[in-house]
Amino acid sequence: MIAITLPDGSRREFPGPVTVAEVAQSIGAGLAKAALAGKVDGQLVDTSYKIERDAELAIVTDKDADGVDVIRHSTAHLLAYAVKELYPDAQVTIGPVIENGFYYDFAYKRPFTPEDLAAIEKKMTELARKDEKVTREVWNRDEAVALFESMGEKYKAEIIGSIPADQEIGLYREGNFVDLCRGPHVPSTGKLKVFKLMKVAGAYWRGDANNEMLQRIYGTAWAKKEDQEAYLHMLEEAEKRDHRKLGKTLDLFHLQEEAPGMVFWHPKGWQVWQAVEQYMRGRLTDAGYDEVRTPQVMDRSLWEKSGHWQNYKENMFVTESEKRDYAIKPMNCPGHVQIFNHGLRSYRDLPLRLAEFGACHRNEPSGALHGLMRVRGFVQDDAHIFCTEEQIVAEAKAFNELAFSVYDDFGFKDVKVKLSLRPDQRAGSDEIWDHAEEGLRLALRACGVEWEELPGEGAFYGPKVEYHIKDAIGRSWQCGTLQLDLVLPERLGAEYVSEDNSRKRPVMLHRAILGSFERFLGILLENHAGALPAWLAPDQVVVMNIADSQAEYAESVVQLLQKQGFRAKADLRNEKITYKIREHSLQKVPYLLVVGDKERDANQVAVRARGNVDLGVMPVSAFVERLQHDVASKA
């Protein structure tokens, strides 16, 4: 007998091996029809998977996140099937699931056009309606290579040829189409009902710029039509809020080909940057951090000691001078350890919190660069806390509270926490990693927050806590991190004198709240659709005169506001007041002040708030109080 334990704790017994589909059928016809896959002892499998021993089983449907992933993975194969039906000469390569969808890369003799995409999507719908069964076959490697070579699929044959000879090869067949895949997949193509092809882009084979360029077709797929419609609506909103367009429209920044991945900040954009930096500097000072500055370029020997040269060199900009190799820093941490090491530290000095608005450079692939969101040169609100093991929980708890408070001030109320665990390529022993991961778990428990664990996503030197903020249109952005590092202090010889006069290694906590300033400012711009709150807006107030006779008074109002610390300017151009109001409204200025003869004579201003809200006429002092309240409350 085989005993199957279901998620509710109930057990079902079967006389012999049983498939996931058969278990679902034994529970009910409705569940059997809805089943897309199964989870056997935590492993995602096809509904045809045969269970041959006692196991825990969850039936996966389209109501589960895993179910939606299976739909998307299967839709990627449906896309490849349709392309092969319409364009037999096209060669298939890879087709993974990505956030909110999937893509598939093809080699074809000509570029796919928008008309091709429409035809492919139509063919996908036809194939889905045929409800062809999707079956898994197990092949040995050499036979699978021969199969794909006989089909003229050189890319697929190359992938399979790189797999160890003794490893089973899983192939999935639907109708006339067969593809390499680990699976799982839906039981039949009829389960795929809601999908849309989005765009075509270029992609190098195996991600290597030295290889041939392929065509990547992106698509999205969902369990329900209304989910897809909501997603497409969100994309429309995102298009309107694109920070690259806002940067140009609002004259904040630009990028150009001569400096790929580097930002040219214009005066107004730099005002926003400075507002954010000064705010963060104040928060860090209040939290007991000391601000430092470390060199941009350091010798290879330091990066070798830190492990960056071995583990991160492909992402570093390197140079040579006077027969010495140097690297531009991709991270600030080794420099901060040098400051810690400069002089003998005592346990009484700990925790030591060193903060730096550190400019870093990373050699990101040119194809991955994207406005402010993915750059090569960036500044981090970086800090490193050197502490004892006993201080980890208290320091992590304090950081967590600071991070949540900062996000709240910037208008982000929905924050999710994730714990990234050890990657395959890492420094340090398993024992060190066990200790580091459990240390962060203890800290999170002390903070009273819920978190999700992400195996394999940690940095090479330690596990990390990630803070994901949700913006106004529902997108999630990973910003802050807290990383526990037991490796770097040892590599770089950091130590302190303990209470018993012995030498000990400090624990090092790497932490950032905003992450990259550039990326965070991009997120802010898109979250607010460019209409930044008054405390962050580059121009908080514009004072406009109706006629030349009020110009002197308008200037005096601006000077008064500037003395109060506000970012104010005058528009004294000989233009119609309606033209001025419209122009500055499009620039999303929080407050527009209009002065005519009546306002001048009464020492007042006519106030318009953003969104064409007429607040009427008020004394300048009353407006100052209003703006002070907005800035202080971060409204």
From Swiss-Prot:
SUPFAM superfamilies: Class II aaRS ABD-related (SSF52954), Class II aaRS and biotin synthetases (SSF55681), TGS-like (SSF81271), ThrRS/AlaRS common domain (SSF55186)
TGS domain residues: 1-61
Main location: cytoplasm
Keyword Cytoplasm: yes
EC number: 6.1.1.3
GO (cellular component) term, any one: cytosol
Cited Gene3D superfamilies: 3.10.20.30, 3.30.54.20, Anticodon-binding domain, Bira Bifunctional Protein, Domain 2, Threonyl-trna Synthetase, Chain A, domain 2
One Pfam family of this chain: HGTP_anticodon
Annotated spans, Catalytic: 242-533
Cofactor: Zn(2+)
Listed name of the protein: Threonine--tRNA ligase
Gene assigned in the entry: thrS
